[in-house]
């Protein structure tokens, strides 16, 4: 929908915010938004918790990046998802930095780790590809998410900050590495992941790993 309608140059951050909510409300189980939608085009995408309004709403320009972070409260769960969308043809720098963020996202999602591991011990997996280029992001990699409860819910989290909370089966956490070039663009890729026992069906290995855990991507 964005690719089709952005070519006119008239599509705005607020247009997208309102259209996304209308799509969401077509579902039978939707009860409302889980947080105000973050809808940032170009430099506004580099503001991690940007809140669009009538005065700040920018048009989606060609050859830029558009970041949208949204979620809903449903009878059977709570969602929080971020996508970064190329409008037109992104620059080579944008492509490379997006790829580094995506590599970190995938590496964390595929992690296999022993019981009693905390989120802070896994955080480096999401950042290492960015660190190779001297880049980083200033927010946590993941926060706990409730089920038809709070979209930010502890005690589990994944971040550089020391955290002794063990990841346990059933915990749901966001996986959201990013990169932000102030005044230019923002990149974030976010799915929700659940901590599971490392069974062969989830890891792709020949047998279960009895003393290990892994993640299942829910989004």
Where are these regions (language model features)?
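Active-site neighborhoods and metal-handling regions in enzymes and metal-associated proteins
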Residues: 1-219
